[in-house]
Amino acid sequence: LQSPSREIASDAFLEFAKASDSTLVEFSKKMNPALLKSWILDPKVPEERLGLYAFLLGGCGRDADISFLLEMLKLQDSRAQATFDGAMVALIRLHPDKGWKALDGFLKADDTPLQTRLSCIRSIKVANEIMQDKSDKAEIFKALNIALKQGELADLAIEELRKMKYWGFTQEILNIYGTKGYTAPVMKRAFLRYALTAPKDPQIEKFLAQLETKDSQMVLEVKESLGLVPLKP
């Protein structure tokens, strides 16, 4: 990564970029936090590398680096946006309480740009992959519930809950279907995928029956996408 040869440095970065999150977590423990911060602050470093460097800081950083990450998250320029995902996950790893509080704050604030909200969703997905403590899982569900209440993010939150097979918000999800802010086709399909995947109970069965009556074609298409029925030739 530090090679004076642009080609060698680029190849090294690509190897990092292709690595799994779990591999990066282990490697991050061997990194030098001061070096990572210098790279993040170096205007000559390409923007596409900043998120990775910030992510790695989460494995080797110290208490003094928490304030650095918090400051990075407050910035709104393009380089800060490129750093955001990695910095958020790094903060959650270094100080879960401050990290989740910061993420929830971004999701709740009315003036948070959409791009930042989407970064928060991506950070939640990564945190779910690399953090296994029950307390972290509880924070993940809490953050997704916040996103669920925001129409522009609800389909993403519902899809993550479905993939995680977490059904604790089923009643809330069914109740908001078709209400203001939750009527776009992509949104309706997210609700339907969730209902088709969730354990069947009377409220789910009723919801699916109503959708079958209102839009049988959509139900069929979503079932096909989930492999629940064979695709038509």
PLM features per residue range, with description:
Residues 18, 33, 48, 57, ...:
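Short, surface-exposed, charged/polar-biased interaction segments
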Residues 10-26, 41, 48-62, 82-96, ...:
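Structural detector for internal amphipathic alpha-helices that build alpha-solenoid repeat scaffolds
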Residues 2-5, 38-45, 71-80, 105-114, ...:
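Solenoid-like repeat scaffolds
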Residues 22-40, 62-74, 96-108, 131-146, ...:
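Amphipathic alpha-helical scaffolding segments comprising HEAT/armadillo-like alpha-solenoid repeats
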Residues 186-233:
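Eukaryotic acidic, Ser/Thr-rich intrinsically disordered low-complexity regions
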Residues 1-13:
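A charged, solvent-exposed segment within the mature domains of Sec-exported extracytoplasmic proteins
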